[in-house]
Amino acid sequence: TFLGLGLEEKPWGPVFSMSNLALRTAAQANGVSRLHGEVSRNMFRHLWPGLLAEEVPIGHVTNGVHTWTFLHPRLRRHYAEVFGPEWVERPEDPETWRVEGLGEAFWRIRQDLRLFLVREVRQRLYEQRRRNGEGPARLREAEKALDPEALTIGFARRFATYKRAVLLFKDPERLLRILKGPYPVQFVFAGKAHPKDEAGKAYLKELVSKIREYGLEDRMVVLEDYDMYLARVLTHGSDVWLNTPRRPMEASGTSGMKAALNGALNLSVLDGWWAEAYNGKNGFAVGDERVYESEEAQDVADAQALYDLLESEVIPLFYAKGLEGYSSGWMSMVHESLRTVGPYFSAGRMVRDYLALYERGALWEKEARARLEALKAFAEALPAFHALGVRPEVPGDLTLNGGRLEVGAVLEGEVPEGLRPHLRVQLVVRRLGGGLEVVDLEEVAPGRYRTAFRPTRPGSYTYGLRLAL
């Protein structure tokens, strides 16, 4: 029944799951990053009870952003001049990102974009305070907010609790030491919570409250009325893009891709798209890939890792300026970020992946009638699959014969013609602490199958036989 397609049993009773309905009726399914695909396979493995998590048919195509939409016009012109016409035609091609040619002119544009960001923040902060009825002194302070020359870290996205906007305040004394240090650092926060997300709205209020409580309004600004224009100003002008989700809650995220396009460096937890983009030279990874059982322990560990990065890597690298007026080490990291993020996390690459992995239209049209007939026969025969069984034939002592394990199987039950082309007998082997291997057995006689498995590494193995379609 229709309701059965979405049915899921919960401890409190049956519920109708739209996710279950979609996965049971879709021809294809995918996550929007490599990690999201992995998480989704584990989340929905109950819909494929005969498969291991690695085999659940949910793939992934990592999100990408449209280069021309999110790249600042001045940088677009500069990139076109430096990279050449090939880049304009094929920005998703890694070979066209000749980043070595970027130099002082690129840095001057970056300085101008930061200045524009600071001016926009001042104007919005002034209007924000005027609208809230704050006094003349507070309005004058807004007109001088932030430093156009200081390292500027942006954080702009939907305010959900798992995104942990207040992670910076986990150790207030450590944060104050960083902000009151010899090098100026400033943060700009912007975003909205979903209207029905009361916890997210409370999180936003908590962020504003903590900034006021610790007297950091000269170094930290929270802007209201977040919109697409402000999002672009922030991704254009920030030097660093901060992202602190609680792993593995972030499906993909795209704001960091937009910031990287414009020359910012990502400072992010290894979640979503950054888990596959980070290579150790193109930005900064907060913490590692561990997931703690306790959210509190996770927050403490990630906060300490964030403070360490700011103190020992991000801030010193940005201010290690040479005679040319900028840090060559910082510029090298920006080059690597542009080279790796620009082409690989573009909408062009994303669309190409979808076409290659999921678009079957032309093939289906060509073979539509034959497929429909085969599908009809398969559907009619499918109920008989559950009556089939497989009996193993293996040596009693499991002695390896010349380094191989000889495995045989006998099929039990009558196989309908509609299932015969699709039926497979498989040996499933897993090494203790290692990965999974699946080997199809060869039919050597009617209803009898055999294969030989040769371990590639020493160790303890578990194995089993199964029927698959």
Q: What spans do the regions from the language model cover?
A:
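Short, exposed beta-strand/loop patches in secreted or surface proteins that constitute
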Residues: 398, 441-442
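Beta-strand-rich binding/interaction modules
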Residues: 404-439, 461-468
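Hydrophobic residues in beta-strands and at strand termini
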Residues: 286, 453-455
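Short tyrosine-centred short linear motifs in exposed loops/low-complexity segments
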Residues: 447, 455-462
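Short, solvent-exposed loop/linker segments at the N-terminal edge
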Residues: 397-403
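Aromatic sugar-binding surface patches on proteins
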Residues: 443-451
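A structural signal for beta-strand and strand-to-loop patches characteristic of beta-rich domains
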Residues: 361-397, 434-436, 469
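Catalytic cores of carbohydrate-active enzymes across secretory and cytosolic contexts
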Residues: 1-369, 384
